Structure formats: C-alpha cells, structure tokens
C-alpha cells in the first residue's frame, strides 16, 4: 500500500505558499492506519525501546497506539504549561524567539531506552528539543520515527538521533 495515496495535500495551509500534508485522511482509513502502525512497529521495535515519547499533538496519535501494539509505556512531550504536576523543561530556539517543551517529572527513568515519535519531520527543531529534554532526564534516546518526512527541509541532517520515516516528500 502506498501511504501517500492516503495523505491529503492541502495547499495554502496554514498560510499562503505552504503545502500541508494532512494525516487526517490516513487516520480515517482503518486499513491504511493498520498498515501505518504495522510499518512503524517494524522500524521502532528493533531499537528495543522501553518507552515511546510522542510529541504534541499529532505525535500522540502515532506514539500511543504504537506503544499499545508493542506493549510499551507512552510519555507525552508537551508545550509549556500543558501538564499537571512537576515537570522537566527544555527551552529551544525558533527562527524568531524560543519555545519550551516539557515532560512530567518521573515519566521517564534514568537509563530507559526511548524512541521519539511524531507525525512529521520538518526542520528537526522540536525533535531535537524533545531528545535533549529526555536526555536531561537520564533517558537513552535510541531513535525517532515519523510518518512523513519533508526531506527538502533537511531535518534529518539536523537531528541528533537515528530517524526512520515511512514516506518522504521532496518538495
């Protein structure tokens, strides 16, 4: 199955000149979603993770069902102020300013093997921030995976962990 056939292309979203790759149509097709999760399992399982970390918010849609499929724990990497209780934070640079990601304290234990998941790899900034945050907590980030890679943005070259993607777009 060609997963690209199930990913809708939305021109001029979220702003003019941007071509948005929408996984909503992939999620809505049970056969395509099963194939997607099966392929994700094949690339993630060999990294022998103890836990999967999903990046807010569409990364949750990938990581949570995959964690269930693989019998692993699931951890949410969220934007600042979205998690209750004590958190560990990491601030990172954006093109114009900064942003912060956080994880609940104790959600990842020192030495645990973690794979980070998201729906899409663009520049790699958020993925690197999540990796640095989890590393700061003592986790061993052994890889990352996403459904879509925008290879023309060269995020793979900027990421600090091995990454797998199921489909790539060159423009």
Curated annotation (Swiss-Prot):
Pathway(s) per entry: Purine metabolism; AMP biosynthesis via salvage pathway; AMP from adenine: step 1/1
PROSITE patterns for the chain: PUR_PYR_PR_TRANSFER
Subcellular location: Cytoplasm
Molecular function per GO: adenine binding; adenine phosphoribosyltransferase activity; AMP binding
Any one biological process term the GO annotation gives: purine ribonucleoside salvage
Pfam families named in the record: Pribosyltran
Listed GO CC annotations: cytoplasm
EC number(s) from the headed UniProt entry: 2.4.2.7
Annotated InterPro entries: Ade_phspho_trans (IPR005764), PRibTrfase_dom (IPR000836), PRTase-like (IPR029057), UPRTase/APRTase (IPR050054)
Top EC category: transferase
Signal sequence annotation: none
Record's catalysed reaction(s): AMP + diphosphate = 5-phospho-alpha-D-ribose 1-diphosphate + adenine
Entry keyword set: Cytoplasm, Glycosyltransferase, Purine salvage, Transferase
CDD domains: PRTases_typeI
Role: Catalyzes a salvage reaction resulting in the formation of AMP, that is energically less costly than de novo synthesis.
Subunit organization: Homodimer.
Family membership: Belongs to the purine/pyrimidine phosphoribosyltransferase family.
Protein name as annotated: Adenine phosphoribosyltransferase
UniProt organism field: Rhodospirillum rubrum (strain ATCC 11170 / ATH 1.1.1 / DSM 467 / LMG 4362 / NCIMB 8255 / S1)
Gene that produces this protein: apt
């Amino acid at each position: 199955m060609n997963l690209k056939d199930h990913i809708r292309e939305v021109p001029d979203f979220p702003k003019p000149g941007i071509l948005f790759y929408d996984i909503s149509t992939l999620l809505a097709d049970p056969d395509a979603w099963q194939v997607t999760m099966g392929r994700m399992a094949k690339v993630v399982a060999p990294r022998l993770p103890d836990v999967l970390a999903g990046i807010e918010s569409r990364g949750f849609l990938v990581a949570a069902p995959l964690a269930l499929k693989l019998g692993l724990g699931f951890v949410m990497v969220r934007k600042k102020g979205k998690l209750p209780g004590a958190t560990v934070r990491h601030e990172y640079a954006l093109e114009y300013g900064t942003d912060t990601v956080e994880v609940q304290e104790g959600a990842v234990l020192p030495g645990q093997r973690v794979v980070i998941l998201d729906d899409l790899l663009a520049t790699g900034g958020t993925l690197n921030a999540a990796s640095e945050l989890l590393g700061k907590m003592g986790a061993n980030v052994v890889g990352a995976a996403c459904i879509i890679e925008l290879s023309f943005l060269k995020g793979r070259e900027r990421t600090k962990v091995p990454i797998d993607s199921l489909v790539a777009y060159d423009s």
